[in-house]
Amino acid sequence: MNRKVYTSRLSSFLPNAPVDNDEMENILGYVGGHPSRIKKIILRQNQIKQRHYAMREGNLTHTNAELMVNAINGLFDNEFDANAIELLACGTSTPDQLIPSHASMVHGLLKGSNPIPLLSVSGVCCSAVQALEFAFLSVLSGHTSNAVCGGSELVSPLLRSDMFEEEYRTINQVQENPYIAFEKDFLRWMLSDGAGCVLLTDKPMGKMSLEIKWIESV
């Protein structure tokens, strides 16, 4: 097989203005009305300074599908637009709904796109890589000459303070068993919202095209 696959364009989308660490609980809410006892420990270790949330005043500003569409729109110009996409593969662990699938919802929001093969992948941190592998194999095999794949997550609704009432009722475990308390609070200070995508092509497009030699996910 002599066909080649290139990453010809990249795009990303982060919703709303960045949120500093000191402002996080103003967006997510205070569990039990009090600042987190674990937050500073986690932030000191992960070194994250800012993040983006698709939520303001407790209300969503973007759906997961909208995050992905905004990222995909960043791939387009006069030479390549939605009408030219031959395959769409989307990975996420937090779809807006199960049916229709995440990729179907993204495709439905893409203005000007034709009927094309779709793939929705759910596999936590592996979701986007598995979508990338499928898109890569499609172009490599000659089934399509290009493919758009990406990953998006909308986790902020799951990080709201009202989702952590059980943790608040056992907050004394911070002192009695710090490991358990850290484990419960950990993801709240690690995750945020956003989307990224890549255009794969069978021929280079521009000076920044990089060839993918192989992808293997297990």
Q: Language-model segments: which ranges?
A:
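Short, well-ordered amphipathic alpha-helical segments that serve as non-catalytic structural scaffolds
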Residues: 34-41, 63-79, 102
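Conserved beta-strand elements of the Class I
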Residues: 6, 86-89, 145-148
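Acyl-thioester C-C bond-transforming condensing/cleaving domain
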Residues: 2, 73-78, 82, 98-100, ...
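Condensing-enzyme catalytic core mediating Claisen C-C bond formation in acyl metabolism
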Residues: 1-62, 176-218
